[in-house]
UniProtKB/Swiss-Prot annotation:
<protein>
    <recommendedName>
        <fullName>RNA-binding protein Hfq</fullName>
    </recommendedName>
</protein>
<dbReference type="GO" id="GO:0005829">
    <property type="term" value="C:cytosol"/>
</dbReference>
<keyword id="KW-0346">Stress response</keyword>
<comment type="subunit">
    <text>Homohexamer.</text>
</comment>
<comment type="function">
    <text>RNA chaperone that binds small regulatory RNA (sRNAs) and mRNAs to facilitate mRNA translational regulation in response to envelope stress, environmental stress and changes in metabolite concentrations. Also binds with high specificity to tRNAs.</text>
</comment>
<feature type="domain" description="Sm">
    <location>
        <begin position="9"/>
        <end position="68"/>
    </location>
</feature>
<comment type="similarity">
    <text>Belongs to the Hfq family.</text>
</comment>
<dbReference type="InterPro" id="IPR005001">
    <property type="entry name" value="Hfq"/>
</dbReference>
<dbReference type="GO" id="GO:0006355">
    <property type="term" value="P:regulation of DNA-templated transcription"/>
</dbReference>
<dbReference type="InterPro" id="IPR047575">
    <property type="entry name" value="Sm"/>
</dbReference>
<dbReference type="Pfam" id="PF17209">
    <property type="entry name" value="Hfq"/>
</dbReference>
<dbReference type="InterPro" id="IPR010920">
    <property type="entry name" value="LSM_dom_sf"/>
</dbReference>
<dbReference type="GO" id="GO:0045974">
    <property type="term" value="P:regulation of translation, ncRNA-mediated"/>
</dbReference>
<dbReference type="GO" id="GO:0003723">
    <property type="term" value="F:RNA binding"/>
</dbReference>
<dbReference type="GO" id="GO:0043487">
    <property type="term" value="P:regulation of RNA stability"/>
</dbReference>
<keyword id="KW-0694">RNA-binding</keyword>
Length: 77
């Protein structure tokens, strides 16, 4: 598993499990808001009034609305 994935997955999964609202900023500056419904290697499903599939390569930043519980530490190689 790539190091990037080993950091992304626990972070996104904690946001999903705890139903934490997030602001997702895209590389073109657009701000999307909602809750993470699901995600995989390439996309995030963001739910607000509708569900949106957002490609990860278009995402600049994911900002949780509040602090999240501790994410398990992943050892680097």
């Amino acid at each position: 598993m790539a190091k990037g994935q080993s950091l992304q997955d626990p972070f996104l999964n904690a946001l999903r499990k705890e139903h934490i609202p997030v602001a997702i900023y895209l590389v073109n500056g657009i701000k999307l808001q909602g809750q993470i419904e699901s995600f995989d290697q390439f996309v995030i499903l963001l739910k607000n009034t509708v569900s949106q599939m957002v490609y990860k390569h278009a995402i600049s930043t994911v900002v949780p609305a509040r602090a999240i519980a501790a994410i398990p530490h992943v050892e680097s190689d």
